[in-house]
Amino acid sequence: MKSEIQIHDRADLCRIEIEGTIGVPEEWQFETPDSRVATYERFRETLGRIARIESPEVIVEIRSTGGDVNDALLIHDALRALPGRITTRCYGYTASAATIIAQAASPGCREISANALYLIHNSICASEGNAAELAAKVELLRQTDARIAGLYAARSGRPVGEFEVLMAENNGNGRWLSPEEAVGLSLIHISE
């Protein structure tokens, strides 16, 4: 899967396509990475173009199995700062960090394809170091999990504990949610 953000804009609508692994440098994923975006740095450049469009409506199409949670949080916050109405649409396997970006939509504007699956899980990292360094990583993972569960709870209006339990299922690997389950949890508003 390519990783990029494409912008298709008109006076009344801006469409953004987010594809690929979030937070992995494009040069590591593709032979010709110039027009592809998977990192917040590249997204920020694109966001400058979006801000100049001043479109009253922005549609973000997400086709990603996730990636780096830090980049996803930064992209989420950048989208939330836009002045127009933001709609997020999830396709295929929308997983992990990609679900954080999906939560950036305006109220009532989070959508999912009828054939998609939506994965929420505890955060993961690869690490090495001594006992103190590893203990610090464990604490960071716990804080990250709490932050992500809090984001899902804030956007859905449901208790944070409900998301902590779902994310911790299967030894922290979480659960793939059907569109109906994602709508039932208010992570998504509309299944198409």
Predicted segment positions?
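N-terminal organellar transit peptides
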Residues: 1-97, 104-192
